[in-house]
């Protein structure tokens, strides 16, 4: 019995050097790699996601950033899960690559679980959640780790994109920035100077395809272990 895998991401600015589809591409590639390891079936991506917060994903201030409302994302994920279960899938793994999606994805999982009386085991993970702690030291050997909220279009995402899809990276357009200071509150309306003009929240200096490979090589076995445990593979 195969595991159905699909991934939620978004179309959001990722500074000047990475494409709008960065989150979708990273989630897709992790899903494809994982599917090879567990003989899974990979569904098409959900390319639109919930609103990005200014100091974790750059916010909605940039052209090309396409946002969904929370209810829209909940019922989009809900309906896809219901269709997969109707088609006979009982083991479903959701690979998330956009932090702000998670609460709404989990809400959809909860609704589906109630409506189907637990007919399927549904697992969700952000690609960075199972990352072993020692990987941070390996990746951030020359610059400090700014925290996951500010690691937007910075070292990890840039390194993963250089590994997964170097043809989509424009490294001549990188802008070295000092890590943005996270605010302890949110405010509406948003202001143009809430985030740097480049959209980057931390430096991507010293990113490389080699570091991207290190991340994949360390995270992929952890994802496999999650699937083996939860799906009894």
Annotate each PLM feature.
Residues 1-92, 97-233:
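Extended, histidine- and acidic-residue-enriched regions that form the cofactor-binding/catalytic faces
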